[in-house]
Regions:
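Short, flexible, solvent-exposed loop/turn segments with mixed acidic/basic and small polar residues
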Residues: 56-60
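Short glycine-enriched loop/turn motifs at secondary-structure junctions
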Residues: 2-5, 61-65, 104
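Vicinal oxygen chelate
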Residues: 16-17, 69-116
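N-terminal beta-strand motif that seeds the catalytic metal site of vicinal oxygen chelate
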Residues: 1-17, 47, 68-70, 124-133
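Conserved catalytic-core motifs of GNAT/GCN5-like acyltransferases
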Residues: 30-36, 97-99, 124-129
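Core segments of cupin and vicinal oxygen chelate
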Residues: 10-49, 53
Length: 133
């Protein structure tokens, strides 16, 4: 058990096997507890529960602004994840790019969706102080 709070998020999926493959192989998440209709994935410090709820799954086009994500601590980790996504053949919704406008200066980020349409943003900031400012 950890002495620090752990954030938990639960999302619907329509195919547990495809979800597990995506989170484990493509994103590199460690898989935790598993049951017939759900499993936990350790998503960069977040306990992510993927539940078989096909009736609750929405297409990416219906997600609007809804997404979750991670700010990776190093450019190396960001690049490794980008390469794993490329090797998996999984497409990006918005390919990783450097944002250079004043508000997002130095942010490197992209978005992709899991096989059930849950949108995930992957980010890296050149200056770690920027992501909470």
């Amino acid at each position: 058990m950890t002495d620090r709070p752990v954030l938990h998020l639960s999302l619907p999926v329509d195919d547990l096997h495809a979800a597990r493959d995506f989170y484990e192989r493509t994103l590199g998440c460690r898989i935790g507890r598993e049951r017939e209709d759900w499993f936990d994935a350790w998503f960069f410090g977040l306990q992510l529960t993927l539940q078989l709820r096909p009736q609750e799954v929405k297409d990416v086009s219906q997600q609007g602004v809804r997404h979750f994500g991670v700010v990776l601590p190093s450019l190396t980790e960001f690049d490794e994840l980008v390469h794993r996504v490329a090797a998996s053949g999984h497409a990006w919704i918005s390919k990783p790019e450097i944002h250079s406008d004043a508000e997002l200066n130095g942010k490197l980020g992209g978005k992709l969706a899991d096989p059930s349409g849950n949108i995930i943003e992957i980010k890296f900031y050149a200056d770690s102080a920027d992501y909470l400012s």
